[in-house]
Amino acid sequence: MQLSWKDIPTVAPANDLLDIVLNRTQRKTPTVIRPGFKITRIRAFYMRKVKYTGEGFVEKFEDILKGFPNINDVHPFHRDLMDTLYEKNHYKISLAAISRAKSLVEQVARDYVRLLKFGQSLFQCKQLKRAALGRMATIVKKLRDPLAYLEQVRQHIGRLPSIDPNTRTLLICGYPNVGKSSFLRCITKSDVDVQPYAFTTKSLYVGHFDYKYLRFQAIDTPGILDRPTEEMNNIEMQSIYAIAHLRSCVLYFMDLSEQCGFTIEAQVKLFHSIKPLFANKSVMVVINKTDIIRPEDLDEERAQLLESVKEVPGVEIMTSSCQLEENVMEVRNKACEKLLASRIENKLKSQSRINNVLNKIHVAQPQARDDVKRTPFIPESVKNLKKYDPEDPNRRKLARDIEAENGGAGVFNVNLKDKYLLEDDEWKNDIMPEILDGKNVYDFLDPEIAAKLQALEEEEEKLENEGFYNSDDEEEIYDGFEASEVDDIKEKAAWIRNRQKTMIAEARNRKSLKNKAIMPRSKLTKSFGKMEEHMSTLGHDMSALQDKQNRAARKNRYVERGSDVVFGDQDALTASTENGVKLRQTDRLLDGVADGSMRSKADRMAKMERRERNRHAKQGESDRHNAVSLSKHLFSGKRGVGKTDFR
């Protein structure tokens, strides 16, 4: 059950609510649309605007409706308190207006979205959007008064104290200025304003304290005047509703000195007037300000008026003085005891709860099947068992005794293998590895392992004697193959393995190239020797081809003549060109440069030329691109004050 409403969201005024929702629509939805776009795109653009705006208003209204409490679902005390403070009908009408506006906005959004689906042009869709947003704005503007009222209620309801109607409560009531707030300050840490004039307390104040490890709350109520309920104001009605609805111990305070401004007769009359509200409650009358006058000092007439209060059944009278802090804690403790006793009594009176518990309890008892008495059986060995006597020299030694004989704790080391059950007691302390040669020893343990090993060795010896492992034909190495065939197979297998290795190496070389250039097969140099070796491996006879190559070489052989000596350079150049040998290429960067100093000067000049291009971010001498002079992200936009982004 909710006891406080401090987390209700702020209720914005009507104009502010309009600005919030419309600005969010402008920021969260697209803003560029042109007549040249497809009509489906234009319709979707404006339908999105209408839907988003309607959802924004509906969301704000739902937050308001969910934040405020439903006055029909709260405790009767809170319901009557809210009725007194905020006028229940006014509160309901305001929330109903918000709920009605929510449904109207939803209806407007649906109707205009349906119309926008048949819009024929941008202008028509835009006018429909304006009409939809205008109708929503009109609906919201009509909520100016309900929204302002709900904001005031939110601010006030958030400051109300958290009062639990069902917990242990001490309720302090009485005429104004009789010492109620002073008593609350004495028994709790509540900082209540105390003044020497009436009606200082205008609302309910709550303080908490502990008694017997239980949490109690004490409520200070505003002063009550003796007049009909219809004539009471909101301040007095808060006290009346607290007395009527809260399960508490009522402390009715009286001032016999009459410094509060009311006579003893009026105070007694008020007690009898509100006596019907004390039904099923513990009541105590507290005579306060005994430092000024005590009950014994009253005259006979006033004493009789005070005695009339005792005639009410269950009412006790106690005295206290908040000024001197006399009997304050005794009054508090007595009230707490009465409250606890009454709560326990009320629980016992509610038979339904007791019956619910009794219905869940069932005590089952076994039924006798015959008249035979079955006494417990105790073996004779147990009966004859002697009680352990530490002084008996023939007693059975315990592990504790053995430890004491061998030096005590910290000196004696317990042998954990002493209780092993083995064939030979000498095996108990043998070292047995758990892991041997990387294997778990326990996986190979077998009680008959020696016998199995001997049987296996005998079987192997028998097979060797029978010649099971000997070959029938020493010349026949493999079934169905002669020795020559086996050699041929091995040779071919070796060639296949070498070929596979070569293919793998070539594939790896191709992968390792990645983005590097690969030399085409047609450009690779091929020698006759490599071709001859390759063809020989394939089983071809290359002798005839070798003779033909030798004859062609002798025919084209060059013989030096006398003229070659004179024109040697030119002929050598011609011969080398004819044979297909490439000329050595020269570095053209060095052409036209006389020496190293000229070369360094040329480098410096080239560097200076590149500096200007780099400053303008040019790609080279041929780059003629002109960049924009104004940055779009800095200079584009509809307004110049920096409030709106470019559209």
From Swiss-Prot:
It is found in: Nucleus, Nucleolus. GTP binds at residues 174-181, 220-224, 288-291. Coiled coil: none annotated. Residues 598-626 have a biased composition (Basic and acidic residues). Residues 168-340 form the OBG-type G domain. Keywords: GTP-binding, Nucleotide-binding, Nucleus, Phosphoprotein, Ribosome biogenesis. GO terms for molecular function: GTP binding; GTPase activity; RNA binding. Pfam families: NOG1 (PF06858), NOG1_N (PF17835), NOGCT (PF08155). Its main location: nucleus. Involved in the biogenesis of the 60S ribosomal subunit. Associated with nucleolar and cytoplasmic pre-60S particles. Directly interacts with RLP24. Belongs to the TRAFAC class OBG-HflX-like GTPase superfamily. OBG GTPase family. NOG subfamily. This is Nucleolar GTP-binding protein 1. It comes from Saccharomyces cerevisiae (strain ATCC 204508 / S288c) (Baker's yeast). The gene is NOG1.
